[in-house]
Amino acid sequence: MIKVLSMMKRKEDLSLDQFRHWLTQEHVKFARQIPGLLRFVVNIPETDSPDNPFDAVNELYFDDEAAMQNAFSSEAGKASGADALAHISARSRLITVEHRLID
C-alpha cells in the first residue's frame, strides 16, 4: 500500500477556519471522485500558530504506485489538484510505504 503525505500551507487571505471548512467540506468532494483512492485522511492543527510550518497534512492511500499515478493523472485527480492550488500557497508531497510499529 502507498500512502501520499501532502503537506499544505493555506493562502494568506484564508483564515484557518475558512481553510478547514474548504478542506473538510468542499475539497473532499473532489477526493471522493478520484479513482483508486482507498482512504483520505485530513490532519489540521487545532489552533492557528505562525510556528506551524503547514496548515494541513493529508494522507492519501492507494493500492500501489500504478494506482496512484492513474489517480493523479485522471480528470478527477487533475480537478482535485487545481482546486487545491486555488486555495494553497505551498505544497510538499512525500510518497511513502507505511510501517505500523505500534497499533
Model-identified regions with their sequence ranges:
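Macromolecular interaction modules
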Residues: M1-D103
